[in-house]
C-alpha cells in the first residue's frame, strides 16, 4: 500500500477545504512546489494533486505549478480537477508527463470518453475519482449531487475496465475524524477495484487500518498539515513493510 500525500491547489496556493466547501478553506502555503519537495525529502514516491479551480470551473488553472513540481521533483504525480476532455488529458500525460490523471465529472457524465481514454493510455494511467455525498456520486468539484448510487456507479466502472478508483466520502473530507472504512470495506467486498482511501484521515492508526485491509493506497492531506501525522516516519515504516504501489 502506498501513502500518498496531497496538495490541493487554488489560485496558485496550497489549500484544504472542509467537507468540500469552497467557502471553508485554509491556506497552508503560497508555494506548493516547496511542499512537494519536502514530501519527496521525507520519502514520498507519489503525489496527489487536485486543481480545485479546475474542478469547479472545468478548466485547468494551476498548470504551471503542476509543471514546476513535475520538472523539479522525481515524484510520480497523479492529478485531478477539471479534466473533462482529451486535450487536457494529453496535456497532462504527454506534455507535462504526469504518471496518471484522475477523472471525476467526465467519468460520471461521459462513459464512452472514459472507455476511449482507457484504450488510448492504458489502465494504469487513467484513475477515476468517485466522490460520494449521502450515498450518491457528486461531480463538478463536489458542487453537484447526481442521482447515481455510488455502488452501482463503481460496478459500472468495473465493467468498463477501470482498475483503480480514489473514493472520497465528502462528509469526512477535511474533518480529521477518520475515513469511512465501512464504505471502503463494502466496495472491496462488492468489486475487485483497487481502492485508494481518501478523506478524513486523522492519524497513523488510519494508515495502519488501510494497510491491514490491503487497500491499494491512502491519501493524506490535512492530517499532515495540522501536525497529526509524521509522514517521514510513516514512509519509513511503509518501506520496511514493503507496500509498493504498482
From Swiss-Prot:
Q: Family assignment?
A: Belongs to the HisA/HisF family.
Where in or outside the cell is it found?
Answer: Cytoplasm
Q: Which UniProt keywords apply?
A: Amino-acid biosynthesis, Cytoplasm, Histidine biosynthesis, Isomerase
State the EC number(s). 5.3.1.16
Active site at 8 (proton acceptor), 131 (proton donor)
- Its predominant location is cytoplasm
What name appears for this protein in its UniProt entry?
1-(5-phosphoribosyl)-5-[(5-phosphoribosylamino)methylideneamino] imidazole-4-carboxamide isomerase
Which InterPro entries has this protein been placed in? Answer: Aldolase_TIM, His_biosynth, HisA_bact_arch, Isoase_HisA-like, Isoase_HisA-like_bact, RibuloseP-bd_barrel
Biochemical pathway: Amino-acid biosynthesis; L-histidine biosynthesis; L-histidine from 5-phospho-alpha-D-ribose 1-diphosphate: step 4/9
**Which GO biological process categories is it annotated with?**
L-histidine biosynthetic process; L-tryptophan biosynthetic process
Q: A single Pfam family, by name?
A: His_biosynth
Q: What molecular function does GO assign, one term?
A: 1-(5-phosphoribosyl)-5-[(5-phosphoribosylamino)methylideneamino]imidazole-4-carboxamide isomerase activity
- Into which EC class is this enzyme placed? isomerase
SUPFAM superfamilies, per database record: Ribulose-phoshate binding barrel
Q: Which GO terms describe its cellular component?
A: cytoplasm
Provide the species name. Answer: Lactococcus lactis subsp. cremoris (strain SK11)
Amino acid at each position: 500500500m502506498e501513502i500518498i500525500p496531497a496538495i490541493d491547489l487554488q489560485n496558485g496556493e496550497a489549500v484544504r477545504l472542509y467537507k468540500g466547501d469552497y467557502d471553508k478553506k485554509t491556506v497552508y502555503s503560497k508555494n506548493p512546489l516547496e511542499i512537494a519537495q519536502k514530501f519527496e525529502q521525507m520519502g514520498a514516491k507519489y503525489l496527489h494533486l487536485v486543481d480545485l479551480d479546475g474542478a469547479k470551473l472545468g478548466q485547468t488553472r494551476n498548470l504551471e505549478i503542476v509543471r514546476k513540481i513535475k520538472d523539479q521533483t522525481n515524484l510520480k504525480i497523479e492529478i485531478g480537477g477539471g479534466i473533462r476532455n482529451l486535450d487536457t488529458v494529453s496535456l497532462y500525460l504527454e506534455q507535462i508527463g504526469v504518471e496518471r490523471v484522475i477523472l471525476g465529472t467526465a467519468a460520471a457524465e461521459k462513459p464512452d470518453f472514459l472507455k476511449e481514454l482507457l484504450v488510448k493510455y492504458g489502465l494504469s494511467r487513467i484513475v477515476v475519482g468517485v466522490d460520494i455525498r449521502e450515498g450518491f456520486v457528486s461531480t463538478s468539484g463536489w458542487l453537484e449531487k447526481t442521482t447515481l448510487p455510488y455502488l452501482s456507479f463503481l460496478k459500472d466502472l468495473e465493467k468498463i475496465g477501470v482498475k483503480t478508483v480514489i473514493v472520497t466520502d465528502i462528509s469526512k473530507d477535511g474533518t480529521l475524524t477518520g475515513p469511512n472504512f465501512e464504505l471502503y470495506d463494502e466496495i472491496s467486498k462488492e468489486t475487485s477495484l483497487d481502492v485508494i482511501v481518501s478523506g478524513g484521515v486523522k492519524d497513523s492508526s488510519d494508515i495502519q487500518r488501510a494497510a491491514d485491509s490491503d487497500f491499494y493506497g491512502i491519501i493524506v492531506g490535512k492530517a499532515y498539515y495540522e501536525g497529526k501525522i509524521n509522514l517521514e516516519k510513516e514512509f519509513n515504516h511503509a518501506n520496511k513493510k514493503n507496500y509498493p504501489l504498482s
